[in-house]
């Protein structure tokens, strides 16, 4: 029974070896897939600077933010337009036909024997110009000439028939308490200007974010390409070991188990190559999306070859200097300051609304009457006929709860805006400190991972020499090959992470544009 079980186990092992050998045979499926020529794809080279410029020109997030920024300029014009003068003109024709029960200015005899008809026709034009003043008041200039005629049997009772009249009037209304003063009147213009400045820095912040994302993605493309080379080198080393083991097994100086171990390693590393190649394509698509090509181009298979190589030199960094630069240049600081200014303006306006409404109203006018239009104008401008008046209007809502509630609300908003500025400064300081530590740590990782890679190379070389003289096994060699590939990948990751950390630090200092000598207009 034990002998039969041993024979069965040997045959199962042999069958498994044959099947694995067929699958991994260079002339069959796995070897065929790896060695098969892929369809020709369009390849493009791209530098980091080119990627940044293309993103500035075409990125959708930047375009959306740019349009929003421009719309804030329109808000300023809308507020300023409230002080534009308004011209209006009104023309009318009226006819009145009424019965009379009495004489009209001696036009009829002392005794009325029947109803007398009063037929009056008038044509008038009113020209009006009005504008709001920066002091909070309003001025209105009105000119209203008219022509009036009555039926002939009554014409004797009038000096002129038809008669021409003209009225020229100037009216001024000026608040003295609520809504009085240039500062109060221009509150919403200043708020709109602050909002426009805020949106400009929101746009700048969006640009910096997109450029930082482009940089991060670009370095991930670099890592993916280099990582594929590591995976291919590991696969090649496993294939060479498999070929050597097969030759030794055929010569009878190596066991079948060593061949199986090498074949399993090849299969595993084929999978790693496939995954690494997919990672490249994924990162390339992410980078292309950030550059916003046309949809037709995005549908096509385009391979991007990065031209820039990651730096491995340590840049001198002063933590306090980095914090000062960030405080000076970060868009969020300007946004918080302008929001605080707008809150103060709104608070002052709300405080003004607590006052009673006291307005001065003054008017003066000239009148004229003539037999024709020219005569009417001359008499109108002669100054012989005039009117004027002045007065004060006072109103105050009892309790004034709405104004007091608004004022309290604006005070709270102002306190929140002030606290937000303090919070933003704290966040920037903490963010810069973390970014500086990350740069320093990642640079040290480069040194340590490089040392680990060198040691892994030496260990693999020594283990291969031991295998040649029969002092080691395939499993140990494969383990050291795997350790070397891992060490190489770790060094690549540390190098790319260091460059991403430099990008992150520039983003925290808001100096990303300076890296490319770019300025936003």
Regions found by a protein language model. Give the residues of each.
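Small/polar, glycine/serine/threonine/aspartate-rich low-complexity segments that form flexible
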Residues: 37-43, 90-170, 305-316, 348, ...
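Bacterial Sec-pathway N-terminal export signals of envelope proteins
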Residues: 31-122, 172-187, 191-193, 218, ...
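Hydrophobic, small-residue-rich alpha-helical packing segments that form membrane-like cores
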Residues: 164, 168, 176-177, 181-271, ...
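Bacterial N-terminal signal peptides
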Residues: 15-26
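N-terminal secretory signal peptides that target proteins for export/translocation
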Residues: 1-11
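Sec/SRP-type N-terminal targeting helices
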Residues: 63-67, 80-81, 134-165, 177-201, ...
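Acidic, low-complexity, intrinsically disordered peripheral segments
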Residues: 9-13, 30-40, 95-97, 285-298, ...
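Amphipathic alpha-helical coiled-coil segments
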Residues: 64-79, 206-230, 240, 247, ...
């Amino acid at each position: 029974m034990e002998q039969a079980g041993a024979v069965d186990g040997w045959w199962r092992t042999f069958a498994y070896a044959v099947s694995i050998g067929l699958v991994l045979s260079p002339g069959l499926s796995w070897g065929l897939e790896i060695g098969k020529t892929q369809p020709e794809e369009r390849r493009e080279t791209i530098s980091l600077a080119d990627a940044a410029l293309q993103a500035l020109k075409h990125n959708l997030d930047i375009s959306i933010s740019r349009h929003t920024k421009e719309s804030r300029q329109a808000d300023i014009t809308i507020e300023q337009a409230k002080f534009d003068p308004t011209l209006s003109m009104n023309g009318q024709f009226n006819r009145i036909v009424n019965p009379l029960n009495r004489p009209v200015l001696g036009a009829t005899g002392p005794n009325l024997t029947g109803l007398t008809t009063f037929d009056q026709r008038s044509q008038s034009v009113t020209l009006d110009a009005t504008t709001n003043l920066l002091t909070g008041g309003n001025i209105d200039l009105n000119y209203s000439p008219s022509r009036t005629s009555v039926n002939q049997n009554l014409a004797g009772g009038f000096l002129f028939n038809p008669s021409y009249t003209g009225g020229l009037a100037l009216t001024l209304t000026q608040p003295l308490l609520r809504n009085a003063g240039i500062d109060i009147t221009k509150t919403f213009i200043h708020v709109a200007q602050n909002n426009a400045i805020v949106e400009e820095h929101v746009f700048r912040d969006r640009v910096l974010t997109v450029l930082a994302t482009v940089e991060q993605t670009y370095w991930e493309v670099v890592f993916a390409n280099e990582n594929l080379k590591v995976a291919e080198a590991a696969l090649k080393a496993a294939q060479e070991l498999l070929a050597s083991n097969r030759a030794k097994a055929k010569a009878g100086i190596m066991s079948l188990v060593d061949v199986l171990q090498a074949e399993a390693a090849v299969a595993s590393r084929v999978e790693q190559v496939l995954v690494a190649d997919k990672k490249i394509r994924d990162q390339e698509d992410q980078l292309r999306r950030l550059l916003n090509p046309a949809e037709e181009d995005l549908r096509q298979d385009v391979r991007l070859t990065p031209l820039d190589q990651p730096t491995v030199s340590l840049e001198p960094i002063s933590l306090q200097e980095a914090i000062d630069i960030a405080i000076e240049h970060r868009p969020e600081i300007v946004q918080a300051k302008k929001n605080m200014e707008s809150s103060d303006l709104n608070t002052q306006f709300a405080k003004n609304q607590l006052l009673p409404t006291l307005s001065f109203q003054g008017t003066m006018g000239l009148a004229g009457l003539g037999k024709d239009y020219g005569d009417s104008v001359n008499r109108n401008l002669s100054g012989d006929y005039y009117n004027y008046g002045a007065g004060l209007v006072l109103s105050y809502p009892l309790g004034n709860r709405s104004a007091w509630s608004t004022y309290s609300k604006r005070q709270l908003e102002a306190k929140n805006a002030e606290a937000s500025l303090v919070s933003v400064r704290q966040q920037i300081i903490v963010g810069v400190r973390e970014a500086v530590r990350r740069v320093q740590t990642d640079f040290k990782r480069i040194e340590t991972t490089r040392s680990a890679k060198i040691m892994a190379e030496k260990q693999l070389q020594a283990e291969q020499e031991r295998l040649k003289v029969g002092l080691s096994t395939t499993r140990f060699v494969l383990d050291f090959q795997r350790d070397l590939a891992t060490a190489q990948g770790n060094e690549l990751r540390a190098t790319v992470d260091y460059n991403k950390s430099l990008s992150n630090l520039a983003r925290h200092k808001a100096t990303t544009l300076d890296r490319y000598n770019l300025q936003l207009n």
